[in-house]
């Protein structure tokens, strides 16, 4: 619930509160309600009190039990049972509804006016009958004594359809080209229609003759109002036997007594938007007038503002619940508005508990956020290395990105850059220190960025202040003190690159302009001194001197630009020669590709194992690699990541090495020493 106060009148917004994501399970919703106070305190007065896209009109039945609303897309009508606080039924329609009327006390008889000239009748069971009118309709009213429906629209005629006979009657011919709105007085049955020319025509249904004509367009123009176009009638409402309120497309509301052709009061919304609806509140003598931006409540006797209501979204229709302080709005948003104003009256019988709740659940307005989820785009996922999670339960697709659990996001963010929080903390501390320094007594010094430009501006400002002709010239704002250019002297991205080709070519012109400016200042000062001494001498200098001076400046500037261009061409030539020399000294070497560390290539035997490993989450893979000792993560000085993988031996290699080791030990153990054997010379005959 959101509470606002204007002129000490409290307005409770019952449809404002934290919205829960639709894809959350019931268990998570219950857990969120236990944990979050804002979610637990929100009030859902009527269940599913919304439209798929936009709500266009909203009305309450005469018995007060049913609330009917039309909207789009697809075009539909929804009926809500207030006694059950839920949706009773929903019916889809063939086209959008312009307006509708409830003919019975409940929802059993409804008439819809569509934007394709169709008139559709619905009974309690559903669709009953459909017919068409000759022109596009904009509004209609029901005359109970004669059972006639009066339709006005893009025609000068007012079409009459008798529901008792089931046929069209002779239309009423008005003097207007088109008619926008109409209404019937419930006391004496006077029929009034608002025209596109800004007039109101009143007709007697018994004689089918016009009995009055009001020129509201002329009366709506006051001394304070600014009118850019012809005001046309956009809203019309009777109250009692003698009072009528008229709303115009230029944002004025005129209050008339039927016995006079002059308005009793003219109220301007000051927005210049068409008045959409007008309602009377008899208990406090108030009038509720609404345009697409605001609902104003003002006294019909004095015109003094009582209070106003300004929703977040544009308004399409406003309905005041009978004999209560509840206000229903149809907005340019799926959710329909429910507002409770205790000063206007008590809460309706079906929600009498609001009187106690409004005293306990007052809270400040807060924006709707998803506290437990982080919204990330596809580019963010690529930077975090989480693109393989797309399609998994860890990511929920929403608009142009995904929702992910905030705990998982912080965990991955910490693994990608473990020192991000420390850097963020240091930046915040540095900003706080700079803010405290800025509050102290500041000395006149140059900014950190673009010092030369700032010095030039300061010198020019000082020269202007020293000169005596500054009084004749309109003072211009200084760039150094202008907030629009403040970033240019604080952000290093705006530093002027004096080594660039554009600056070097433009620099002679800038320097010559500054020299010319100084010379002109000196000449003007000398000229003013001469004028004081000799008043008869004419102002200025001879034209030939000016032309010679300008020609000399132009020649010097052209020579300087040519010189800078020659220097740039020489530098470019030297750079090309250096690049050519480097290319000649470069020796092409073969490029080798190695397998990832921690893996070995054994044909395609382990493809199933690798596939199973790749299907695991990033957290599980990191745990496995850290456990095996094949992965080590470290940070470099420039803020990037360095990953080191250790090649591990396979099980077959380990077994082979163990077998060789055992074989060597066994050979060593079974080996017999032959050190005791010595060679002896055999005796025999010597050869001669």
Swiss-Prot record:
Entry keywords, A to Z: Acetylation, Coiled coil, Nucleus, Phosphoprotein, Repeat, WD repeat
Highest taxon of the lineage: Eukaryota
Molecular function in Gene Ontology: RNA binding
Localisation per UniProt entry: Nucleus, Nucleolus
Name under which the protein is recorded: Nucleolar protein 10
Composition bias, Basic residues: 664-688
GO terms (BP aspect): maturation of SSU-rRNA from tricistronic rRNA transcript (SSU-rRNA, 5.8S rRNA, LSU-rRNA)
InterPro entries: Beta-prop_NOL10_N, NOL10/Enp2, NOL10_2nd, NUC153, WD40/YVTN_repeat-like_dom_sf, WD40_repeat_dom_sf, WD40_rpt
Subcellular location, principal: nucleus
Protein family: Belongs to the WD repeat NOL10/ENP2 family.
Gene3D superfamilies per record: YVTN repeat-like/Quinoprotein amine dehydrogenase
Pfam family, one: Beta-prop_NOL10_N
Chain segments carrying region Disordered: 529-557, 645-688
Bias (Basic and acidic residues): 648-663
Positions bearing Phosphothreonine: 481
UniProt KW rRNA-binding keyword: no
WD-type repeats, residues: 44-82, 88-124, 127-163, 170-205, 219-258, 262-300, 304-341
Modified residues (Phosphoserine): 25, 475, 514
Source organism per UniProt: Homo sapiens
Sections of the chain in a coiled coil: 423-446, 514-589, 640-673
Modified residues (N-acetylmethionine): 1
One Gene Ontology cellular component: small-subunit processome
């Amino acid at each position: 619930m959101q509470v606002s106060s204007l002129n000490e009148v409290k307005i409770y917004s019952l449809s404002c509160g934290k919205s829960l994501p639709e894809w959350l399970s019931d268990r998570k919703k219950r857990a969120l309600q236990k944990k979050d106070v804002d979610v637990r305190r929100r009030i859902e007065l009527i269940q599913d009190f919304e439209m798929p896209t936009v709500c266009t009109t909203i009305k309450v039945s005469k018995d007060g039990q049913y609330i009917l609303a039309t909207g789009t897309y697809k075009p539909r009508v929804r009926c809500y049972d207030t006694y059950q606080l839920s949706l009773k039924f929903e019916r889809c329609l063939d086209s959008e509804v312009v307006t509708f009327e409830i003919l019975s006390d409940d929802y059993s008889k409804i008439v819809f006016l569509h934007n394709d000239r169709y008139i559709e009748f619905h009974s309690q069971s559903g669709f009953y009958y459909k017919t068409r009118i000759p022109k596009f309709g904009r509004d209609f009213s029901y005359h109970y004594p004669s059972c006639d429906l009066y339709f006005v629209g893009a025609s000068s005629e007012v079409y009459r359809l008798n529901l008792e006979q089931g046929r069209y009657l002779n239309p009423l011919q008005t003097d207007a080209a088109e008619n926008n709105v109409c209404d019937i007085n419930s006391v004496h049955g006077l029929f009034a229609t608002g025209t596109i020319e800004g007039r109101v025509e009143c007709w007697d249904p018994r004689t089918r003759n016009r009995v009055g004509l009001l020129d509201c367009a002329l009366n709506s123009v006051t001394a304070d109002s600014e009118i850019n176009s012809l005001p046309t009638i956009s809203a019309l409402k009777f109250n009692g036997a003698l009072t009528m309120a008229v709303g115009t497309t230029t944002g004025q509301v005129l209050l008339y007594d039927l016995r006079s052709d002059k308005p009793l009061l003219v109220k301007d919304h000051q927005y210049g938007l068409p008045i959409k609806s007008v309602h009377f509140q008899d208990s406090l003598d108030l009038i509720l007038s609404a345009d697409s931006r605001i609902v104003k409540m003002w006294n019909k006797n004095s015109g003094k503002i009582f209070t106003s209501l300004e929703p977040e979204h544009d308004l399409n229709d406003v309905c005041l619940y009978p004999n209560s302080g509840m206000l229903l709005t149809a907005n340019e948003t799926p959710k329909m508005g429910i507002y409770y104003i205790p000063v206007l009256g008590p809460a309706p019988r079906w929600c009498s508990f609001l009187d106690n709740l409004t005293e306990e659940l007052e809270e400040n307005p807060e924006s709707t956020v998803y506290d437990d989820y982080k919204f990330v785009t596809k580019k963010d996922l690529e930077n975090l290395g989480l693109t393989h999670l797309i399609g998994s339960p860890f990511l929920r697709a929403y608009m142009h990105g995904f929702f992910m659990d905030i705990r998982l996001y912080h965990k991955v963010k910490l693994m990608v850059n473990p020192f991000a929080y420390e850097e963020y903390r240091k930046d915040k501390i540095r900003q706080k220190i700079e803010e405290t320094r800025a509050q102290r007594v500041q000395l006149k010094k140059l900014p950190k960025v673009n010092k030369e430009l700032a010095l030039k501006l300061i010198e020019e400002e000082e020269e202007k202040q020293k000169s005596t002709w500054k009084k004749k010239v309109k003072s211009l704002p200084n760039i150094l003190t202008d907030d629009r250019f403040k970033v240019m002297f604080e952000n290093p991205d705006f530093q002027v690159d004096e080594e660039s080709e554009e600056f070097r070519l433009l620099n002679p012109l800038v320097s010559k302009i500054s020299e010319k400016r100084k010379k002109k200042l000196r000449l003007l000062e000398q000229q003013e001194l001469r004028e004081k001494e000799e008043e008869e001498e004419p102002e200025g200098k001879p034209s030939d001197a000016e032309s010679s001076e300008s020609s000399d400046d132009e020649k010097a500037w052209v020579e300087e630009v040519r010189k800078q261009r020659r220097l740039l061409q020489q530098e470019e030539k030297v750079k090309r020669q250096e690049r050519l020399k480097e290319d000649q000294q470069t020796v092409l070497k073969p490029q080798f590709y190695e397998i990832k560390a921690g893996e070995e290539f054994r044909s395609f035997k382990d493809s199933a194992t690798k596939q199973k490993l790749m299907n695991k989450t990033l957290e599980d893979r990191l745990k496995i690699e850290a456990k095996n000792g094949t992965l080590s993560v470290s940070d470099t000085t420039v803020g990037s990541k360095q990953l080191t993988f250790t090649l591990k031996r396979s099980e077959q290699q380990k077994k082979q090495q163990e077998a060789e080791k055992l074989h060597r030990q066994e050979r060593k153990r079974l080996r017999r020493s032959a050190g005791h054997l010595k060679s002896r010379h055999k005796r025999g005959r010597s050869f001669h």
